[in-house]
Amino acid sequence: MLDRLDAALRFQQEALNLRAQRQEILAANIANADTPGYQARDIDFASELKKVMVRGREETGGVALTLTSSHHIPAQAVSSPAVDLLYRVPDQPSLDGNTVDMDRERTQFADNSLKYQMGLTVLGSQLKGMMNVLQGGN
């Protein structure tokens, strides 16, 4: 039964983990907007999610726990999976070699934030529905 519950929540869990990682990458791009030679980075979210889901099924028959902080107690958990970072190709290269386009980064940051919040909402509604069923509700 627990494996069915895990399977029901696996997609949202992994999507949220990747969204959080992407948010950190986008924040680093924004923080380094004025750093000469800094190369803006990002991930291909869809392909990374697919890789994580396939890898989770192959390794454990499910998706393993993910450590999000070095202060967490490891319990058969693995650290966040390494994602393939891609370099952004700038529309207009700057003279100092920095490839951060602040308009694009802010847009991507806001879009990723909204999708993260949507993922939390969907996960919350899935959990609420499961609790309703477990409590004998309609």
Swiss-Prot record:
Free-text function comment from the UniProt entry: Structural component of flagellum, the bacterial motility apparatus. Part of the rod structure of flagellar basal body.
The protein, known as: Flagellar basal body rod protein FlgB
UniProt keyword Oxidoreductase, yes or no: no
InterPro entries reported in the protein's UniProt record: Flag_bb_rod_N, Flagellar_basal_body_rod_CS, FlgB
Annotated signal peptide: none
Disruption phenotype: Defects in flagellar assembly process.
Single biological process term from Gene Ontology: bacterial-type flagellum-dependent cell motility
Family as reported in the entry's similarity comment: Belongs to the flagella basal body rod proteins family.
Cell location: Bacterial flagellum basal body
GO cellular component: bacterial-type flagellum basal body, rod
Pfam families from the UniProt entry: Flg_bb_rod (PF00460)
Predominant location: other
Assembly description: The basal body constitutes a major portion of the flagellar organelle and consists of a number of rings mounted on a central rod. In Gram-negative bacteria, at least four rings, L, P, S and M are present, whereas Gram-positive bacteria lack the L and P rings. The rod consists of about 26 subunits of FlgG in the distal portion, and FlgB, FlgC and FlgF build up the proximal portion of the rod with about 6 subunits each.
Keyword terms of this UniProt record: Bacterial flagellum
UniProt lineage: Bacteria, Pseudomonadati, Pseudomonadota, Gammaproteobacteria, Enterobacterales
Organism of origin: Salmonella typhimurium (strain LT2 / SGSC1412 / ATCC 700720)
